[in-house]
Amino acid sequence: SEMCIRDRHYAIPHFNVWNAEMLMGVIDAAEELRAPIIISFGTGFTGNTSFEDFCYMMESMAKKATVPVILHWDHGRNWTILKNAVDHCMNSVMRDASALPYEENVAEIKRCVDYFHAYNIPVEAELGHVGNETVYEEALAEYAYTDPSQAKDFVERTGCDSLAVAVGNVHGVYSAEPKIRFDIIEEVNKEVSVPLVLHGASGIGDEDIKKAIQCGIAKINIHTELCQAAMEAINEHKDEPFLAVERAVRQAVKERAMYKIKLFGDDGRADE
């Protein structure tokens, strides 16, 4: 199925969700558009939401959904965190060792793959470093683009199931127009057999997203834009009761998720 996604030029949306409104909103969107999706939690949200409790709502809604919904742990920083994620319903993980030197990244991902594949859990890795600086120009100064020939070696040696690439994308809000290196996406796609993942996609323009998918991106992570949609709804409904505000947030998240599903060409794919 991974090969079909690569060859068919669409991308599966990955939505970070850390509260009921976001979770329900993206599942509403997936159901309405008959779209397979990935829903995801990560360490950055544990200060807001108890993962060990919220995971059961994620799992319950994923199981009830009439479209495929994968439960993913985003940017796993260490072994303990990933094991906890898998002990609490997650059926897909990302081990982000991209800040480590190359050989250490290889060794760490191989270790994860060897362990998690025994439980039938796919492992996403990152090669190159996207970083987390708030100013785009500063982020690029510290940036490590993915090296296509290294990517080939990396995927072959680790056995990772998908690969997050660094191609001019950064996390959070872009302070300047992002410059996506489509040439790198194409070269990496030629060199490796696994789906490629684009992180930090919220601020990237629609045309660039479509082009990235044509070049080989098969999974796209969205978080900031869901938050922006939620905030707009909160501002519009701020004089209403909290119950009404919550419903407005769920609807706004749904609408933004539907927009992304259509943009990525993922609508209707659940029924193929």
Label each region the model flagged.
Residues S1, W18-S40, G44, E52-T66, ...:
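Alpha/beta enzyme core
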Residues M3-I5:
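Short, small-residue-biased leader/transition segments that mark boundaries at the very start
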Residues H9-H14, E272:
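Terminal accessory/targeting
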Residues I12, F41-T43, L243:
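A glycine-/small-polar-enriched, mobile loop at the entrance of the PLP active site in fold-type I
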Residues I12-N16, L71-H72, M94-R95, L196-H199, ...:
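Short catalytic-loop micro-motif centered on adjacent basic/acidic residues
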Residues N48:
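Cofactor-binding active-site loop characterized by glycine-rich and histidine/acidic residues
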Residues V167, H199-S202:
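Short catalytic/ligand-gating loop segments at beta-alpha or beta-beta junctions
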Residues G205-E272:
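C-terminal alpha-helical cap/extension of soluble enzyme domains
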